[in-house]
């Protein structure tokens, strides 16, 4: 970790009243959580991810929400929903590693070497988006980080897939069936993790509605467990801590300059470190997110641009 002993910053604006920055993540009131929070939702089967996000928007009284990675209507599981200003950070899920549990339905009895066949797909694979996809149908590479058989029957496998964002699990199941010589299709599919969110902290729509009702009666405990500070979605990114005066300049649209940098450090979750051209989150000394940006130069320099602004979060 690089630490700086000086907290100089450029003067900002002409107002005599400095703007108020967000409170530390663990000290926010419920209104602040609702306007800059994230719900790790257990998406039910049936509605689309967009429909579910709209329900949460209406239930929480926010003008805007976003979700962290779409799920088809029949797919269940981990769907982080970003509330209010947190919707600006939805891009952090674009390249997040995803994990799924799926049923592989073989069209004939599994061959004796099915485990070896499955293991061959734990690599970079090539896929073309399906005809109904919203993206251009061109061949592209996707990494399968791990592929484990959790259960096995004569014609059915329960698989856990950890993969790059944008992997088509249905196509993966089809290709495994071809390699096995039996043919196969995907059965049930559930997402168990996306980025730093997993199925260990999921909440249902019913949980959220009940918690909102309790909060309206003065009991905030359940809602505070469900709506997490938005910074939770950024814990996999390297951090650049900046002075409050520099944070106020960012709020006015300025990037982060070297004199305003206090220190840099690795991600709270994972092993990402602040490298040139890497995505970083700039935070205040008490941990409140200020902006997403790209580290463009040495943060220990005496002058110059350090973090180019991608998304303002204040």
UniProtKB/Swiss-Prot annotation:
Residue ranges with Basic residues bias: 1-10
Annotated spans, Disordered: 1-30
GO MF: RNA binding; tRNA pseudouridine(55) synthase activity
Catalyses which reaction(s): uridine(55) in tRNA = pseudouridine(55) in tRNA
Biological process terms in GO annotation: box H/ACA sno(s)RNA 3'-end processing; mRNA pseudouridine synthesis; rRNA pseudouridine synthesis; snRNA pseudouridine synthesis; tRNA pseudouridine synthesis
Keyword Isomerase: yes
InterPro entries (alphabetical): Dyskerin-like, PsdUridine_synth_cat_dom_sf, PsdUridine_synth_N, PUA-like_sf, PUA_sf, tRNA_PsdUridine_synth_B_fam, TruB_arch, TruB_C
SMART domains according to UniProt: DKCLD
Protein name: Probable tRNA pseudouridine synthase B
Organism this protein belongs to: Haloarcula marismortui (strain ATCC 43049 / DSM 3752 / JCM 8966 / VKM B-1809)
Gene that produces this protein: truB
């Amino acid at each position: 970790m690089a630490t700086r002993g000086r907290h100089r910053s450029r003067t900002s604006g002409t107002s005599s009243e400095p703007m108020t920055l967000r409170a530390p993540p663990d000290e926010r009131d419920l209104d602040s959580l609702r306007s800059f929070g994230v719900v790790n939702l257990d998406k039910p089967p049936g509605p689309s991810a967009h429909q579910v996000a709209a329900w949460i928007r209406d239930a929480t009284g926010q003008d805007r929400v976003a979700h962290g990675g779409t799920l088809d209507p029949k797919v269940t599981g981990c769907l982080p929903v970003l509330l209010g200003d947190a919707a600006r950070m939805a891009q952090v899920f674009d390249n997040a590693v995803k994990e799924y549990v799926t049923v592989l339905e073989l069209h004939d009895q599994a061959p004796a070497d099915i485990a070896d066949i499955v293991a061959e797909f734990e690599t970079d694979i090539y896929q073309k988006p399906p005809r109904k996809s919203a993206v251009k149908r061109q061949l592209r590479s996707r990494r399968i980080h791990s592929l484990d058989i959790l259960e096995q029957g004569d014609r059915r496998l329960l698989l856990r897939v950890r993969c790059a964002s944008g992997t088509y699990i249905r196509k993966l199941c089809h290709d495994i069936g071809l390699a096995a010589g039996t043919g196969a299709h995907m059965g049930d599919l559930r997402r168990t993790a996306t980025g730093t969110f997993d199925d260990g902290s999921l909440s249902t729509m019913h949980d959220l509605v009940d918690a909102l009702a309790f909060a309206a009666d003065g009991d905030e405990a359940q809602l505070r467990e469900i709506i997490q500070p938005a910074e939770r979605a950024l814990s996999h990114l390297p951090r650049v801590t900046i002075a409050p005066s520099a944070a106020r300049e960012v709020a006015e649209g300025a990037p982060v300059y070297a004199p305003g940098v206090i220190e840099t450090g690795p991600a709270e979750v994972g092993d990402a470190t602040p490298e040139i051209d890497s995505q970083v989150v700039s935070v205040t000394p008490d941990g409140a997110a200020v902006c997403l940006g790209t580290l463009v130069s040495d943060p220990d320099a005496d002058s110059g641009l350090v973090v180019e602004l991608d998304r303002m979060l204040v």
